[in-house]
Amino acid sequence: MRVKKNNGTKKSWLPVSILLLVLLPLILMPLSAIFIFAGGGGLTNFLMIISSPEAQFALRFSIIVAFVTTVINGVLGTYAAYVLSKYKFKGRQTLSIIVNLPVAIPTVVVGTSLLLLWGPIGLIGKFIDPIGIQPMFAPTGVILAHIFVTFPYMLGAVKPVLEELEASYEEAAYTIGASRWQTFRYIILPALKGGLFTGGLLTFAHSLGEFGATVMVSGNISLKTQTAPLYIFAQFEAGNIETANAVAAILALFSFILFFFLIRYTKRKIIS
């Protein structure tokens, strides 16, 4: 009897066709529609739209907020991951659940909670507002919201790396007289490069597209606190479909580039 070799893959047009039928209306067609409508008025019209002060501010502000958020969460997320992975203490599991809560909480609820804390009538805001300190409806509030929403992504990327790092490396560094800072700088930090890169890309990408918390804490003020997603929403509400599509296409393209680098890095890591 002749036995057919199986290389671990199955060839069939039916499962692939079913998958494509599902993906086309759910993902591929909506994404294609953005670029089709964005270019519907021609290249000149497209360039004119994205050259407007409001559109350029929204795109630039989104990138700045995403960058600042990524840097801050890079520090906070790495510190939290180190504490949760290297120290044993009562309530560690509970604390681990708490720091990951932003993933489960609707972003609009996040925005509401920040307003109730830092807003003009908030628990803290009512004391600092009279002296001229008001983080809400300002860039500071937007950054606070994005830090809250994206914090688990950096933590989730760095913590597994620290858990896999053998304690013997740190102990060896201590035995030759290295300080905690030197051990972190020369032993731990180099090992975290991959986790920081992945967490940074995920944080940046999610910050770029954040809407729910941002719309609550920013006031959606043009040329002040309006991010690209808020600008797109405002233009759709005003009936400026071409304008909204043009900025949406730029934002989508930027997200695709980030995703490409993430996939490429992950693939190289698996191969190595």
Sequence positions of predicted segments:
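Transmembrane-helix boundary motif in ABC transporter permease subunits
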Residues: 2-8, 44, 68-99, 112, ...
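Membrane-interfacial helix termini and adjacent extracytoplasmic/periplasmic loops
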Residues: 3-6, 43-51, 56, 91-92, ...
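Periplasmic/extracellular loop-to-transmembrane helix junction in inner-membrane transport proteins
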Residues: 6, 36-71, 86-87, 237-241
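C-terminal transmembrane helix and the adjacent membrane-cytosol boundary/short C-terminal tail
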Residues: 7-18, 26-29, 33-36, 91, ...
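Interhelical loop and adjacent transmembrane-helix boundary motif
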Residues: 7-12, 46, 53, 214-260
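Transmembrane alpha-helices
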Residues: 16-20, 101, 111, 148-150, ...
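Alpha-helical transmembrane segments of multi-pass integral membrane proteins
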Residues: 18-22, 32-33, 65-70, 81, ...
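Hydrophobic alpha-helical transmembrane segments of multipass integral membrane proteins
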Residues: 25, 60, 64-76, 80, ...
